Amino acid sequence: MRTPLARVRSLGASHSGTSDFWRQRLTAAAMVLLIVPVIVVVIMLLGRNQAGAAQILGSLPIAIILLLFIVASTWHMKIGMQVVIEDYVHHEKLKLASIMANNFFCFAVATASIYAILKLSSGV
């Protein structure tokens, strides 16, 4: 049973825990499948300058693998930190501010990473 204030704030038992649980498992499975190719790409990039890195990242399959890994890992990070914040931050204003900061941080990391991969893969 939620109070009207809790409904407005969208905090409390929203019965979305199961979907968050499965989303986190889905992103974890995606990262498990993508980690070996990502490690291979990182090893290929060791010791290369920007031109060499752009040449390797210019390959469409490699860029796609890295982009998928970035999206999966930042989404996984967002969900995991949100669960920790919801469980352990008890002051409502601090909880709301922390969730907003978490969302902003994860979006910023994903955006910057995607931009970097796209810029390097385009050869600019």
Where are these regions (language model features)?
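Membrane-embedded alpha-helical bundles that constitute the cytochrome b-like, heme-associated redox core
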Residues: 1-124
